[in-house]
Every structure is written in C-alpha cells, then in structure tokens.
Amino acid sequence: MTSPENPDLPDADDAYVDSGPGTQPASLEDLDMDSASTMRPMATQAVYRPEFDDTDGTSRGTVVTEAYDQVTMATRALSPMRRLGGGLVEIPRVPERDPLTALMTNPVVAESKRFCWNCGKPVGRSTPDGRALSEGWCPHCGSPYSFLPQLSPGDIVADQYEIKGCIAHGGLGWVYLAFDKNVNDRPVVLKGLVHSGDAEAQAIAMAERQFLAEVTHPGIVKIYNFVEHEDKHGNPVGYIVMEYVGGTSLKQARGAKLPVAEAIGYMLEILPALGYLHSIGLAYNDLKPENIMITEEQLKLIDLGAVSRLNSYGYLYGTPGYQAPEIVRTGPTVATDIYTVGRTLAALTLSLRTRRGRYVDGLPSDDPVLETYDSYHRLLRRAIDPDPRRRFTSAEEMSSQLLGVLREVVATDTGVPRPGLSTVFSPSRSTFGVDLLVAHTDVYVDGQVHSEKLTAQEIVRALPVPLVDRTDVGAPMLVASVLSEPVHTLDQLRAARHGALDTEGIDLNESVELPLMEVRALLDLGDVAKATRKLEDLAARVGWRWRLVWFKAVSEMLSADYDSATKHFTEVLDTLPGELAPKLALAATAELAGTADELKFYKTVWSTDNGVISAGFGLARAQSVAGERDMAVQTLDEVPPTSRHFTTARLTSAVTLLSGRSTSEITEQHIRDAARRVEALPDSEPRVLQIRALVLGTALDWLADNTASSNHILGFPFTEHGLKLGVEASLRALARIAPTQSHRYALVDLANSVRPMSTF
C-alpha cells in the first residue's frame, strides 16, 4: 500500500486500471510518437476514429468461437499449485485476498501522473510560485480537472453501495471499493464511465455502456449495474459497478520477465474470453498485463472501460505500445485485438525498447528469448504483423498455434517430449529415412550395394497432409478420402465431378478442398506437372492460401527445386508456427539439398514429439554428418520401445558406433557397446545376423592394431581366434538365408577365408 510519505501509486493497486495517467481523448495526429499524449508513461488513452468508409479490403467482422462452460466444483482443499495451458505449465496458486487490504491509505495522484483529461497536457504541477493544485482548470484548454476522490468512505451510492475507499486511479479517475448493502455486503468495484466535467458526455456514456451488462463469461469481470451519483457540484456522474476480483494482476506478478511457458499459459486462459467478446460483436481493445487478474482459481479480464463494438468509430480507448497502429482507420476488429495479445506476450517475456514512456513497435532483434524459441518468435511476428490481414484470423486460431508453441517450449525447457494432436494437419502417414543407415549392411544378405540416399518421393508419401477445411462445401464427401489410396481418391473426385455421387444440391464448383485433394493425389502418384497446373488454376481463383502453398512446396520438392520448396514451407511455418509438419518438411528438404538447417528442425520435432520417428532418425543422421556420433546414438536410444521401429533404432545405433570411423578412432568401449545392443535382440529379428557380422568383423580388424580384454562379445572371446570363429559363424548363418546360389557360395568362401587355422 502507499504510505503518506510516498504518494506515488503502487503497482499493487493497479488491478482494475493502468497506474499511469488518465484516459485521454486524442486526435488523429496524436498517433504520432512525438505528440504530447504519447510522451507520457504508458496508460490507456483514446484515439478518435471518424465515421468514414474504409475500402482498402482489410478484413473485419466477428469471429464466432465457443464460450467456455462454467464448471462448479465441490469444496475441497486446494493444492498450492495450479496448472495452465492444458496442464503443461504449473504456477503458484494466488491466495484469496481480503478486499479491505486493497484500500489505499493515502489516495493521492503523484504530480508526474497528472494530465488534462481533454488535451493530454500536464496539469496540477508544482511551480516556482506555489504548490501543486489537485483540482482546477487546465491552463492549456480550460477544462476542469480534479485528482481528488469524488466519493468518500461511508458515502452511499444509489441507495445500495457503501463506499469503503479508493483502490486505484486510472484513466477515468478513481476506482472505489464498495460493499453492496442489498447483497450481503458483497464487495464490488465502482469506476467512472467518463470524466465528470461534461454532463452531456456522462449521459451518452451511460446509454452506450449498457451493452456491457450482456457480457457473461467466466474469464471476464462481471458487470452488476450502472448507477449515477451527484458530485459536489450537483452534476450526475455515471459509474459502472463491477465484480471485485481479488488477486494479483499480471503486471504485479511478473516483476522481472516471465518464463515464456508461463506467459503462454496465461494467454491461453485469456484468449477464450477474447474469442467470446468477438463472437458477440465486441472488441476488448486494451489488453495488457495490468488488465489481467490472476485469482485463486482462474484468470480474468478486468477493466471493461475500453470495450467497444467491432468496427465502431468515435473515441477508441487503448494503450500506446499495445494498441494496433491501424485502429483509427479500421476501427476495432478481431485483428486489432490479436495485435494486443502479441504485444502483451512480448511485454511479459522480452526486453522491449521504450521511447518517451511507451513501448516501441516491433520486436528486439537481439533478444536471447527469441533466439532460443524460434517458433515463439514466429508466432509473435504473425500476431503483430503490420498488415492486419496477415495476423491470426481469430482468437481460436491463435490459441491453437499458441498451444503448439507451448508444447515446444516446455519440451525444450524440461527435456521431456510433449506431443499433441494438430487441428490442421494429419499425423505422419508413414516414415522416411528409417532404414538408411542400416541399408548398406544388406550387402551381407544379397550381395547388392544399397543406396543410402533419401528421396523426395519417400518423404512426400510420409509427410503429414493438411486436414480438410470443415467449412468447405465439399468437406463432407472428403472425410473418408483423407487416408485413401491416390487412385481411389481420384476415382471418387471424378465421380463427384460428373454428378455420380449425391451432393444434396451443393454446388461443388465452389469447393477449394475438392481440387486440392486432387492435387494431393496427383503428387502422391508423382504427376507433378498436372498437379502444378491444377494448383495454379485454383490459386488464380481463390488466392495462395496456406494449404495451397503447402502443396506448391511439395511439388517443388518433387521437382528438386529445393530453394523454392524451402521458401514456401517456411511461409507455411510462419503462418502456423505451432505446427510440427512444416518443420519436418523443412528438415527433410534441407537434407535433400545438403544444407545444414535440417539438424535444428529435426531436433525441434523430435524433442517435442518422439512419436515422429522420421524426425528421430533424421536427427541422428544429421548429428552423424556433423561428427556428433555419440549424440546420434543417444538420439536413437530415445526411440520408445513401443515403436515398431525400436529394433531398427537399436541396430542403427550399433552401426553408428562403428561405421564412418577409422580403426584408430574406434575404442573397445564402442565395440562392446555395439555388441550389447545387438545381443539384446533375438536372432529372428531382420538384419540382426548381418549387424552381428559387422560388429564381429569390425572387432577383428580393430584387434589387429590394438589390445583388449578377453571378455566375450556376442558369445565369443575377444581374441583373434574367438572373433574369427564368430565372424565365420555369422557368415555361414547368412549363407543359409541367401536369396541366390551365387551369393550363398560367396558367403561360404568368405567364411572359409576367415576361419581360424585348425591345430591337431
């Protein structure tokens, strides 16, 4: 609380409003950073949007999302910790707070925070001629001002609300704690609607703010009432009566910068509330840490003073540094609210630069947080894109991507995979590159040299594919085709095109998903030219949406145009930063192109979801190429035993330990480690026999220049005689399963040449 010796308002009392200067109306010129209003510390301010027609094509309107159902829980002992973000983030539980402890002992506004509510210029400051006046008339515009509380403890407002005192001061004056005498002394908060100097504005504000009473969401502070009370001059002053939310604001909670995972967890709880507002045609407009309260059970949006109807005009309230730059031109939109979410996340986690008391637009290029969490960086970039059409289209879409980013962040921080199902991509359809490192040992079996090259066709057949857009008119008939064979899919689409299927009167010519499914089937069949033509025709009709860009990148990969494929997969990733599919595609493309980028993308996918087996084997290959063979073995050891590729991973790790190294680089420990991995697998497993031969043969070569203990490996003494017996036995076992007579003879001859000389 504030002490009499320090009249500056504390952060602890900023729960309902910003602790900065008062809310200020501003003209269009006030958006310039050199204007007087923006030279003040950050606080909720107003900009004026005139009523004019904006024809630049910027998308506006409501986005319907589902509201959360309120859940009533039985009384129970609460854990000192609670979880956010789908259980991925744990935070301390905020204890319940006695409302009276929030009262300010000395409700005084510091001189540095006194500004005229009308023109935004400093008022009430000390001068050489005398002390500062807490009320008077602005010397610049003549408007009356007062920084004294208009309500005193004991006042009864509307014959119902007993004022207990001030708890904060914000843009529209003092915020008061009161007890509702009609409802068992329930604590409530009273806040002025507009400045009290304009009676006509008071009446208009009372009428305009009535719509807030219709807002009902568990993540938004409740509006109980709208009342009037005469000030000392006899003028009616309107107040909004709100639920008292005890707890801590995010501004108080953060202190230093928050961990990224914690900040994302908070935003995931707030986004459904924003989505609800958008669904009923409202914009919040003033999201910032000060306006988010952490209570014992949940997070809540407080301070609805800036809420307005979507696309409205007139005075629009917001905070410079958080407010979208285009709001004067477009009015409040879903996109302007999304911008504030991005800026709030940035303020919570990054060291943002400030100028003249407000955050500078954009993101710091050298912040280590952005270097550590690439997907988080991409998400912030999209959320605050200067072009509102490129931002997330809804709170629901941003929430989905934010959850994906959270899984990556938590996996990075803890080293524990955090897999989850995507809402826009299918799971991987199969695997690629799993057998590459062990394939060359197949020469023992059939005498044929096997390629270790990854192919684009193999990758494309395995990559996830975009899920069908459920809003598309052709979606119902495509649900069953998602995992169909390409030829079958083309037959279905051909039948639909010729009316052989019942489409219930729907004009399938309007569908985007039907031709897109045809493109996918053609690419799976390798008909890149035809798929590309159809894709370009579709793009000419509907534009390059992200699903189209994905398949364009796939076609470029198949055409070996890896630079273009990388560019377009990156475009998809920038649009959907929480998805693993574009990261897996970028890793595979980089491996095909022979660049070094595959390691970081394979690593991100594998560390987040160890069910994406292709990423694990890809990461191991990349680590081997980089000379990090021990790391590659560790990666292969992370393949879960429940995977059908577990045996291949064990065999590949054995090969990785020994291959690609000179005899001088191999140690006895490498050989014994490889032998233990093979020995743990039954001989009936494919490739076990040939890897046994490889391990024993490598040990025999190594022993020619080195010495080792004679302890057995794979059942044979670690001696020249013992290893020769082992190699001979392995070669004869392989000869018995050789597919051709000639290779069988070759293996027998090789076994005879290795066989130790008999002594009698």
Swiss-Prot record:
Residues 161-403 form the Protein kinase domain. GO terms for molecular function: ATP binding; protein serine kinase activity; protein serine/threonine kinase activity. Its EC number is 2.7.11.1. The active site is at residue 286. One of its GO terms (biological process) is regulation of metabolic process. It catalyses: L-seryl-[protein] + ATP = O-phospho-L-seryl-[protein] + ADP + H(+); L-threonyl-[protein] + ATP = O-phospho-L-threonyl-[protein] + ADP + H(+). ATP binds at residues 167-175, 191. Keywords: ATP-binding, Kinase, Nucleotide-binding, Serine/threonine-protein kinase, Transferase. It comes from the Bacteria. InterPro entries: Kinase-like_dom_sf, PknG_rubred, PknG_TPR, Prot_kinase_dom, Ser/Thr_kinase_AS, TPR-like_helical_dom_sf. When artificially expressed from expression vectors, encodes an active kinase, which is able to block the lysosomal delivery of mycobacteria inside macrophages. However, while PknG transcripts are found in M.smegmatis, expression of PknG is blocked on a translational level in this non-pathogenic species. This lack of efficient translation is caused by regulatory elements in the upstream region of the gene. Belongs to the protein kinase superfamily. Ser/Thr protein kinase family. This is Serine/threonine-protein kinase PknG. It comes from Mycolicibacterium smegmatis (strain ATCC 700084 / mc(2)155) (Mycobacterium smegmatis).
